[in-house]
């Protein structure tokens, strides 16, 4: 049966490396061509929305509410046009971010009302949810240092430290109350993080991989 696996985390948490480890581990189990997605984005229209969220507009500031709505509009496109059809066709899906990012960044970081965030999720996704989320937990200071070392920061990456501290608090709140979320200490050295991801995924696949 097809599954939907999501990698989550703050900027600089190592999501791209985690995704590579997940794909390699799945391949060892004969799952060789999962559909990969990213949020925001993943469809032609959703990528346009991603550009607005990431870069803004030179002539007009993007309000927090507009940002929230763009993110959920992009998610609706991706889930409806890519993720659900892929799963229905029997394909596994590995996603770089999903709804938990909005709950953390917009709910925690931006401070949107919890009821509003729950309503947005319910309205756009219904009961659709990932089978497994691997949350890469990292101290925001370290994460931002890593992100800065990659080069020019986008609109979100330029947010102040307290934004990411609030986002991390919300991430951890969800992770500590949802058995489908596995937390990885992403502040460790690369080899240790890699081993942790593979070990956690192997355990999960042993009981959920069929």
From Swiss-Prot:
**Which of UniProt's keywords are assigned here?**
ATP-binding, Kinase, Nucleotide biosynthesis, Nucleotide-binding, Transferase
Q: What GO biological process terms are annotated to this protein in UniProt? A: dTDP biosynthetic process; dTTP biosynthetic process; dUDP biosynthetic process
UniProt xrefs under InterPro entries = P-loop_NTPase (IPR027417), Thymidylate_kin-like_dom (IPR039430), Thymidylate_kin_CS (IPR018095), Thymidylate_kinase (IPR018094)
Nucleotide-binding in keyword set: yes
Q: Does the keyword Translocase apply?
A: no
Q: Where does ATP bind?
A: 9-16
Question: Which reaction(s) are listed as its catalytic activity?
Answer: dTMP + ATP = dTDP + ADP
Q: What is its EC number?
A: 2.7.4.9
Q: Which CDD domains match?
A: TMPK
Enumerate the Pfam families for this protein. Thymidylate_kin
- Could you state a single Gene Ontology molecular function term? dTMP kinase activity
One GO location term (cellular component): cytosol
Enzyme class (EC, first level)? transferase
Q: Which PANTHER family would you find in this protein's record? A: THYMIDYLATE KINASE, UMP-CMP KINASE 2, MITOCHONDRIAL
What family, per the record? Belongs to the thymidylate kinase family.
Q: Which HAMAP family match?
A: Thymidylate_kinase
Function, as annotated:
Phosphorylation of dTMP to form dTDP in both de novo and salvage pathways of dTTP synthesis.
Supply the name of the protein.
Answer: Thymidylate kinase
The coding gene here is tmk
